[in-house]
Regions:
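Surface-exposed binding/hinge segments that line
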Residues: 104-108, 147-189
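Aromatic- and charge-enriched surface segment that lines or borders ligand/interaction sites
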Residues: 101-143, 294-296
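Detector for C-terminal structural segments
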Residues: 210, 307-337, 384-393, 414-531
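Ligand/substrate-recognition segments at binding pockets and active sites
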Residues: 361-431
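Gly/Pro-rich hinge or "lid" segments in bacterial periplasmic/extracellular proteins
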Residues: 94, 170, 176-228, 232, ...
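Ligand-site clamp/hinge motif
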Residues: 192, 220-266, 393, 401-404, ...
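Structural transition elements
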Residues: 324-363, 385
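N-terminal lobe/hinge region of extracytoplasmic solute-binding protein
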Residues: 58-107, 137, 199-200
């Protein structure tokens, strides 16, 4: 069974100068889309008492650690209802308060944020201004992924329940920047190295953690907000795609995350589970290591992009569940006009000409050589990108490139990046949010997402202009200019928005469809049928 729901079009990086919980609640409720009926437990005649309910989520992977500043951790904790930020983005793309109660822009470079008076860490420690500042500063210091969203902000406590945020840039969308999972609020005084020492604020507490296997959660009885009705959540790591699919089709699990498009056919005539497809503002991207000699040449990088048939890649790598794009930012609906910029069509002839100009000439064996050495490219893939990697390998081979693909665990990619022994990898980062934070986080010389070492003077100058842009139209114009210029330089190759497919059991009710599904799976609205 299939359920395809479209979220409202997302406004780019927008938030009003006043954000408050009372004023946002009504719009938020109207914006939410739910699947399988009402999410109100009192209206579910078939619901059972919370004390006996257990929800099982099958994921491709679980959090690697319990420390929110470590890689591959906070997104999973927030997705499971463990971690919270000051703000969050609802399904309509609106920024609403979470641990904050309200936010007010005092002047172009100053915000005041009032905190919820009843919010506590699991330990019972108050979520006051000093604790929030300590958390954000710890994230700034230790989490490279958080730094673009905290850059240029200075925090100070006005009162126990109020903090001031001063910004270097005028009109910085502070609530939006503080809605990202990388800014999750945690007790900075805690060690976060075990179930016993971690200290978060979410509606679910971690009670068991077995790395690479499962995380078990129970209700936080002191939660400040609406408590969930399901007593226990188990997030299991099932790396194998088919095993994960069979887990939900058999009824063993209630949610299966990151379903590969190749598995869609198994749900067509199934009455046990449904596939939810939410539009995602992210871009399936090939990151190139510019420290490798063959990839240091911009003509080679441009050839790699011109020589890709993206329509075929969507079919082979995403089962047709996406659309081709040629620039990174264009997966954000607000920048969809740039979807076909620079690389306007698949052009193998142009790719060949560029490789010829770069000195890589075809030999009788069909491969391209320069100074007696073949043009090689090693692509590392992980997760559900195996078929995509093989399709890319075939298309590049047709250009005379000796392409190889290594598919494995993400840790292999991390290790290769640490040693520098890699040519290309695939990632899909979100393109929704403040344009400067997003683009600088990818293309500034020391940015966390700048895996390949891109350092381009023109890009750096444009980023500096974007940082100082005062009005929305100027920001938009500069963002489009940076987006197109980077595509021309080709340190990365944009392919298509990564399909965001989630399978949910027909016994689960109140599931919210969200364009940022990766951090909005578990909510207090979920209920289960009696068994």
């Amino acid at each position: 069974m299939f359920i395809f729901l479209l979220c409202a079009t997302i406004a780019a990086a927008g938030c009003s100068s006043n954000v408050n919980s009372a004023g946002s609640k009504g719009n938020n409720d109207q914006a939410k889309s739910s699947v399988n009926g009402s999410s109100n437990a009192s209206e579910q005649a078939h619901s059972i008492e919370a004390g006996t309910q257990e929800l099982i989520v099958a994921g491709q992977e679980i959090a690697v650690t319990l420390d929110p500043v470590q890689p591959l951790t906070t997104a999973y904790l927030r997705n499971m209802g463990v971690a919270e930020a000051l703000f969050k983005v609802n399904a309509a793309g609106e920024v609403i308060p979470e641990l904050a109660e309200s936010a007010t822009a005092i002047d172009p470079t100053t915000w005041e944020i009032k905190l919820r008076s009843n919010a506590l860490f699991w330990s019972g420690k108050a979520v006051d201004a000093e604790a929030v500042i300590a958390s954000l500063e710890r994230s700034r210091e230790l989490d490279l992924q958080a730094q673009p969203f905290l850059e240029g902000m200075t925090f100070s406590a006005i009162k126990d329940d109020t903090l001031k945020v001063e910004t270097e840039r005028e009109h910085l969308p502070v609530p939006l920047n503080l809605s990202y999972y990388q800014t999750a609020i945690h007790n900075a005084e805690a060690k976060h190295d075990s179930v016993e020492t971690m200290d978060m604020t979410g509606m679910y507490k971690v009670v068991q953690f077995v790395p690479k296997q499962k995380i078990v959660l129970s209700i936080n009885e002191n939660y400040w907000g609406e408590k969930p009705s399901i007593a226990t959540v188990v997030h299991e790591e099932i790396a194998d795609e088919q095993t994960r699919v069979m887990s939900i089709l058999s009824g063993r699990s209630h949610i299966a995350l990151n379903v590969n498009p190749s598995s869609l056919a198994q749900f067509e005539h199934n009455d046990k589970a449904a596939i939810i497809a939410a539009p995602a503002a992210n871009t399936q991207t090939i990151y190139l290591n510019l420290n490798q000699s063959q990839l240091a040449d911009v003509k080679v990088r441009q050839a790699l992009s011109w020589g890709l048939d993206r329509e075929e890649l969507v079919v082979l790598g995403a089962e047709g569940q996406s659309v081709p794009i040629t620039t990174w930012l264009s997966s954000n609906p607000a920048y969809a006009e740039a979807a076909n910029a620079v690389y306007t069509k698949f052009d193998a002839d142009k790719a060949g000409e560029l490789l010829d100009e770069a000195g890589w000439l075809k030999d009788s064996d069909g491969l391209r050589y320069k100074d007696g050495n073949p043009l090689t490219l090693r692509l590392m893939t992980w997760g559900g990108d195996k078929a995509l990697g093989e399709a890319l390998q075939n298309q590049w081979n047709n250009l005379g490139i000796k392409a190889e693909v290594q598919h494995g665990d993400y840790s292999l990619i991390e290790t290769a990046r640490e040693t520098g022994d890699w040519d290309a990898t695939i990632e899909a980062w979100s393109t929704f949010g403040d344009e400067y934070a997003l683009l600088s986080g990818q293309y500034a010389p020391e940015a966390r997402g700048n895996f390949g070492g891109f350092n381009d003077e023109a890009t750096n100058q444009l980023l500096a202009q974007l940082a100082g842009a005062a009005d929305a139209e100027a920001k938009r114009k500069l963002a489009l200019q940076i987006n197109e210029h980077v595509a021309e330089q080709a340190p990365v190759i944009s392919l298509f928005p990564r399909p965001q497919l989630t399978a949910i059991s027909q016994s689960l009710h109140g599931f919210e469809v969200h364009f940022r599904q990766f951090e909005n799976t578990i909510t207090s609205r979920l209920t289960l049928d009696a068994q």
